[in-house]
A protein has these predicted regions:
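Polytopic transmembrane helical bundles with strong interfacial aromatic enrichment
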Residues: 1-147
Length: 147
């Protein structure tokens, strides 16, 4: 089952990750505008709410593909021939797991207004770095050996 669904799931995972990268990038840009005295409250709230479902969706799609990846891609190819790609994947997955509470925190704290801004600013920038790293490293790993 996973073998037949792996490629469409990988494409959906990549598209969701790209949308997530766009949303986190836009949130950081909007927050930067606020730091410079040009607040965009509605955009900041919208991106804060959009990021959590995108993050959870991308994470869930990755988890769905993991059994196929682990057996058919990693065990048969990457571990033996490209161990650096296996290590990069492990780092990517662990870093993405750290992003889950940050994305959920943005979702819930993003509505609280000025009192929560220092926390949401930190969450947004950190999450943007995690997502950017995960997208780039995911593309590198897939270019070595995709599903």
């Amino acid at each position: 089952m996973f073998t037949q669904a792996a490629k469409p799931l990988l494409v959906l995972h990549a598209l969701t990750a790209m949308a997530l990268l766009g949303a986190t990038t836009h949130l950081v840009v909007v927050k930067t505008l606020r730091w410079r005295g040009r607040p965009r409250e509605r955009l900041e709230q919208m991106y804060s709410r959009l990021i959590a479902p995108l993050f959870v969706g991308a994470f869930f799609l990755g988890l769905t593909m993991y059994p196929h990846f682990r057996v058919d891609v990693r065990a048969r190819n990457l571990d033996a021939n490209q161990p650096w790609a296996s290590n990069l994947f492990d780092f990517k997955v662990h870093l993405a797991a750290i992003g889950v509470p940050l994305a959920l925190g943005l979702f819930f704290l993003g509505r609280r207004g000025p009192a929560a801004r220092p926390v949401t600013d930190l969450f947004a920038v950190t999450l943007w770095l995690i997502v950017a790293w995960s997208v780039v490293s995911g593309l590198i790993i897939t270019s070595v050996r995709g599903v």
